[in-house]
Amino acid sequence: MHKEALAFPPEESTLFFINSHLIITYDKQYFVTLRVKYLISNSMSESKRIKTALVSVYHKEGLDEIITKLHEEGVEFLSTGGTRQFIESLGYPCKAVEDLTSYPSILGGRVKTLHPKIFGGILCRRGLEQDIQQIEKYEIPEIDLVIVDLYPFE
């Protein structure tokens, strides 16, 4: 394992959530390709295929590689302000969180994804018919992958 990746406290972190799995990466440059290959190879069987990714990051270094690999696998993106603009600048379509929630970003951009349509899509239990019926009733998209990092609160 790359020793610099274990430095603590990390200067920046990226959290990947995949259907109840969590991967924490501290060194984007070293792990980007490795982690994206892992995510795709271990999650892209038809039963666990990543179809939609919620992406909202402050530090965008290395994000282009992740987005490109996911786009190549047919993943659709859902994102917030600056991250959405970044994804679109790479030439990939991206749906705005605000369009899904019908609610604007508030408190200086710090509150964007705290909404039942977002959390419902992440927490939906795909094997439970009651959950599937509710997300269909409320038009909540399933969110299979979440990529976020920690906002530098000062």
Kindly give the residue locations of the regions a language model identified.
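Acidic, Ala/Val/Gly-enriched low-complexity intrinsically disordered segments
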Residues: E4-A7, E11-E12, D27, V32, ...
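N-terminal glycine-/serine-/threonine-rich phosphate-binding loop
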Residues: M44-L100
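Glycine-rich nucleotide/cofactor/substrate-binding loop typically near the N-terminus or early
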Residues: G82-E154
